[in-house]
Structure formats: C-alpha cells, structure tokens
A protein has these predicted regions:
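Glycine-rich phosphate- or other oxyanion-binding loops that anchor nucleotides, phosphorylated ligands
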Residues: 1-141
Length: 141
C-alpha cells in the first residue's frame, strides 16, 4: 500500500494502473496509465456483499528496488494508493485478446516515507479467503 489509511482492512479495486513495467507496452499503445475496465462491476459486487473496499489508481512496477522515495512520492501525488507487480501487463494482454479481467488486491506491505511495514505480507499472500472470493466473482459474472 502507498496509503495505509485508505487501504487498511479493505480490498483495493484498481481503477487505473501506472505502467512502470515493460510487458504492457507490447500489447497496448504507450501511455502512462492503463484503465482497469471492470472495476465498477467489482465495486457493485463488493457493495452488495458489504465487503470493505476502496477504489483508486495503483502503480505497477517490475522492479522493487526502484521503488525509490522520489518515485513513491510521485506516484502518490498522482493518486496511486497501492503498488503491485502485474496488473498493467495483465490488463493490456486482456484488452489485446478481448478477455475480461476482474482484479482486486489486498495490501500486505506498506511503503511510507522512511519506513517499510511488512506485517501483513503473509496473510495477503497466503490467505485462501481471496481464492474463494475470486471464485464467487467468477460465478457471478
């Protein structure tokens, strides 16, 4: 997460992903952000089930070592609330081939200036509840 107050205890429904990786540029025209197309459908799903969520921009990067103070600050100024490693590329591929992508995230670590919190990483990466939620989403679309 880049905004702990906004994302803590909530699912993150990305609206756009900053393209800080290379894959998406092979499948979509060059631009800084790629729109995440089904975020509003997912928001309706989460709202109907009274699941806590927040919508916002995210930053896709394939290089954790380049999550520098200045780049983190810049992405936050642009409205990014989380950072992840795949979404821009997966959305670009989905758009290219005509697939529907339904993406939600859970913050496991928090990048805040001068600190890096990792307390939630294990649960975010290994909690099976997200798999069951994804299966419910797949059945409902």
């Amino acid at each position: 997460s880049l905004e702990k107050e906004a994302t803590d205890g909530k699912f993150i429904l990305p609206t756009e992903a900053y393209r800080g990786e290379g894959l998406s540029y092979y499948f979509a025209e060059p631009q800084d952000y790629i729109k995440i197309k089904n975020t509003d459908k997912l928001a309706e799903f989460f709202k109907e089930r009274k699941l806590p969520y927040v919508q916002g921009r995210v930053w896709t990067t394939d290089s954790m070592l380049r999550e520098t103070v200045n780049l983190v600050r810049k992405r936050k100024e642009e409205g990014c609330i989380a950072v992840e490693m795949e979404l821009a590329g997966v959305q670009a591929i989905s758009d290219f081939y005509g697939f529907e992508l339904y993406d939600f995230l859970v913050a496991g670590d928090v990048l805040i200036e001068g600190n890096y919190e990792t307390d939630g990483l294990s649960a975010a990466n290994h909690d099976l509840d997200k798999l069951f939620l994804a299966l419910q989403i797949a059945k409902s679309v």
